Amino acid sequence: MWFLPAALPLLPLLLLLGQAPPSRPQSLGTMKLRLVGPGSGPEEGRLEVLHQGQWGTVCDDDFALQEATVACRQLGFEGALTWAHSAKYGSGEGPIWLDNVHCVGTESSLDQCGSNGWGVSDCTHSEDVGVVCNPQRHRGSVSERVSNALGPQDRRLEEVRLKPILASAKRQSPVTEGAVEVKYEGHWRQVCDQGWTRNNSRVVCGMLGFPSEAPVDSHHYRKVWDSKMKDPNSRLKSLTKKNSFWIHRVNCLGTEPHMANCQVQVAPAQGKLRPACPGGMHAVVSCVAGPRFRPPKAKPGRKESRAEEMKVRLRSGAQVGEGRVEVLMNRQWGTVCDHGWNLISASVVCRQLGFGSAREALFGAQLGQALGPIHLSEVRCRGYERTLSDCPSLEGSQNGCQHDNDAAVRCNIPNMGFQDQVRLAGGRSPEEGVVEVQVEVNGVQRWGAVCSDHWGLSEAMVACRQLGLGFASHAIKDTWYWQGTPGAREVVMSGVHCSGTELALQQCQRHGPVHCSHGTGRFSAGVSCTDSAPDLVMNAQLVQETAYLEDRPLSLLYCAHEENCLSQSADRMDWPYGHRRLLRFSSQIHNLGRADFRPKMGRHGWIWHQCHRHYHSIEVFTHYDLLTLNGSKVAEGHKASFCLEDTNCPTGMQRRYACANFGEQGVTVGCWDTYRHDIDCQWVDITDVGPGDYIFQVVVNPKFEVAESDFSNNMMRCRCKYDGQRVWLHNCHTGDSYRANTELSQEQEQRLRNNLI
């Protein structure tokens, strides 16, 4: 980050926020810290603490940016850029001294923060936390002057908001224009407009979830201000005479992700002897909302091409504006390595996508891993760039990045007020219950229930997102065991149908007049939310490498016929004479999410399959289809049901799920379930299909029976050439790995190279 040099006459009264309270000398605390491990510089590494003469580690449970900020300041840096969980910088040795550390963010030492106590932990060294500090260090003389002048070390800017002044601004949602108010030491203050710049406005807008700022009609606002100052009964007039009403001066470069990183002068240089903001008024800011948050018929801030919008995207985030960062290069989507990843680069991504600045820059695949290429590493944005492609970077393959280094972001988004229009009632925890919404009924805002007709996982996902509770683990249609809020049990919303991308249930399609076939009561919609979810992805390359044709005798297909794994024409054959032509392949399904994939049904619902000699826990886990080029189905796999297990896991990770002996079923995070090409029903029966060009398609979790953090990567497609005797699969890829308008041309090129046309 970059800071303007402080003017020496103002040093006693400057608050350099974001570098936060200046660090005190190490001797003032009883705790010593160090950073160790394979970091790229002295500002990052595994965090270790010296206690009772022995170095130990800190567990990553509940560790977040405010804890990292305290640690970095204690180490002499200006603040933290981010932190790393799961022993990114290697597992430590010795004791785990601290667990569940909780800081406000203003402390000068970690020993001033809450925790379980010295050595009280249920963690292992695989959970050792690391930090990445701002490489800029404190300058001793400046730190001492600021520290001595400010006294208590807990002064900081906490929040920023816009107070709408004009009637037109008050009617908008979100509020995009108004006077800047800053929460400082627990109280809201207004900011003097003297010296206020567009750079300051840009930072404020970014914090509020807006990608850019717009010019303000200062002359009009000045007239409004002067009229209030002339009113002898104006409360504002008396308040402005108090220095405690003002933040005297703000100076930002415009690249900062938070006003806490700007220079802020709380009071004038002469303190109480000189009034703050003499002759000035409150600073007014106008922000430009991103496309998803603009009011109807609002004009865009600038012309945005579809190509520009689609060069970066976020995946696997629970909330809008968060996710794993993926960029489009060479017509293929790939990830960004977290080496050198920080808040400034993350903010460029957020603004490019129409959000505000970055609230958090995450690394270590904290929001899940991807398959496919890693396009970028060592991204070094300055903060001025319009797109991530404008920033200096290296190729991801140049410095040993793996997908456990996938970078992610959490962006600031505007407050739309949607979270106040939904609530859960009657559940055993705050994360579950009957869904109650606030809607307008006959001109009056009322709370009521949602009809569970057609209520599914997509709708539940939107509800959990609106509540700020992450993903939906279950969409519940029968809620008789949960008592709703008295007076809110009547159904006020029915026919809800969501695509899954909406910000709120109120944005989904629904009935005009309420029509609920079940009425009220036990059939109100409910949800159970969770902060993490699995993410299943098919290994497309393995499908392409293992596909082949087999003419299998009917005498070997009795079990498969019994399980309905053959096309209907097999029923009319003279068993056991003849054969079926099968397109066989192996499928390997990876769980790249942050939670285990578990079957929806409990053990009581599992089905014993005599042919396979084990239980199947899920009715439809994947669909296998052969399609014409226009999408019509010509053949399909008929695998009746599936057993879920950890076929393989990465080195050092133990398999947890197995089909044998009525074992627990599922797919562990990081592991994969493999269905070999030579097992029963692992095929598509193409006996009745003629030669031609086709699309081979596999869809995982096709009915959305189990929640995932990302459903867009559940489809795998290949181009298929069948000449009546041989089959070729080529250009196999997950459904979202290529940009749509380049997919066809790439397939054409591949076929030309393979001499298939």
Curated annotation (Swiss-Prot):
<feature type="domain" description="SRCR 1">
    <location>
        <begin position="33"/>
        <end position="134"/>
    </location>
</feature>
<keyword id="KW-0677">Repeat</keyword>
<protein>
    <recommendedName>
        <fullName>Lysyl oxidase homolog 4</fullName>
        <ecNumber>1.4.3.13</ecNumber>
    </recommendedName>
</protein>
<feature type="disulfide bond">
    <location>
        <begin position="381"/>
        <end position="391"/>
    </location>
</feature>
<dbReference type="GO" id="GO:0004720">
    <property type="term" value="F:protein-lysine 6-oxidase activity"/>
</dbReference>
<feature type="disulfide bond">
    <location>
        <begin position="205"/>
        <end position="287"/>
    </location>
</feature>
<feature type="domain" description="SRCR 3">
    <location>
        <begin position="312"/>
        <end position="412"/>
    </location>
</feature>
<feature type="binding site">
    <location>
        <position position="614"/>
    </location>
    <ligand>
        <name>Cu cation</name>
    </ligand>
</feature>
<feature type="site" description="Cleavage; by BMP1">
    <location>
        <begin position="570"/>
        <end position="571"/>
    </location>
</feature>
<keyword id="KW-0186">Copper</keyword>
<keyword id="KW-1015">Disulfide bond</keyword>
<dbReference type="InterPro" id="IPR019828">
    <property type="entry name" value="Lysyl_oxidase_CS"/>
</dbReference>
<dbReference type="GO" id="GO:0030199">
    <property type="term" value="P:collagen fibril organization"/>
</dbReference>
<feature type="cross-link" description="Lysine tyrosylquinone (Lys-Tyr)">
    <location>
        <begin position="639"/>
        <end position="675"/>
    </location>
</feature>
<feature type="glycosylation site" description="N-linked (GlcNAc...) asparagine">
    <location>
        <position position="630"/>
    </location>
</feature>
<feature type="domain" description="SRCR 4">
    <location>
        <begin position="422"/>
        <end position="530"/>
    </location>
</feature>
<keyword id="KW-0560">Oxidoreductase</keyword>
<feature type="binding site">
    <location>
        <position position="616"/>
    </location>
    <ligand>
        <name>Cu cation</name>
    </ligand>
</feature>
<feature type="disulfide bond">
    <location>
        <begin position="72"/>
        <end position="133"/>
    </location>
</feature>
<keyword id="KW-0801">TPQ</keyword>
<feature type="region of interest" description="Lysyl-oxidase like">
    <location>
        <begin position="534"/>
        <end position="737"/>
    </location>
</feature>
<feature type="binding site">
    <location>
        <position position="612"/>
    </location>
    <ligand>
        <name>Cu cation</name>
    </ligand>
</feature>
<dbReference type="InterPro" id="IPR050912">
    <property type="entry name" value="LOX-like_protein"/>
</dbReference>
<keyword id="KW-0886">LTQ</keyword>
<feature type="disulfide bond">
    <location>
        <begin position="611"/>
        <end position="659"/>
    </location>
</feature>
<feature type="disulfide bond">
    <location>
        <begin position="59"/>
        <end position="123"/>
    </location>
</feature>
<dbReference type="GO" id="GO:0062023">
    <property type="term" value="C:collagen-containing extracellular matrix"/>
</dbReference>
<feature type="disulfide bond">
    <location>
        <begin position="671"/>
        <end position="681"/>
    </location>
</feature>
<feature type="disulfide bond">
    <location>
        <begin position="252"/>
        <end position="262"/>
    </location>
</feature>
<comment type="function">
    <text>Catalyzes the oxidative deamination of lysine and hydroxylysine residues in collagen and elastin, resulting in the formation of covalent cross-linkages, and the stabilization of collagen and elastin fibers.</text>
</comment>
<feature type="disulfide bond">
    <location>
        <begin position="103"/>
        <end position="113"/>
    </location>
</feature>
<feature type="disulfide bond">
    <location>
        <begin position="464"/>
        <end position="529"/>
    </location>
</feature>
<dbReference type="GO" id="GO:0005507">
    <property type="term" value="F:copper ion binding"/>
</dbReference>
<feature type="disulfide bond">
    <location>
        <begin position="498"/>
        <end position="508"/>
    </location>
</feature>
<keyword id="KW-0964">Secreted</keyword>
<keyword id="KW-0732">Signal</keyword>
<feature type="disulfide bond">
    <location>
        <begin position="337"/>
        <end position="401"/>
    </location>
</feature>
<feature type="disulfide bond">
    <location>
        <begin position="559"/>
        <end position="565"/>
    </location>
</feature>
<dbReference type="InterPro" id="IPR036772">
    <property type="entry name" value="SRCR-like_dom_sf"/>
</dbReference>
<keyword id="KW-0325">Glycoprotein</keyword>
<feature type="disulfide bond">
    <location>
        <begin position="643"/>
        <end position="649"/>
    </location>
</feature>
<feature type="domain" description="SRCR 2">
    <location>
        <begin position="160"/>
        <end position="288"/>
    </location>
</feature>
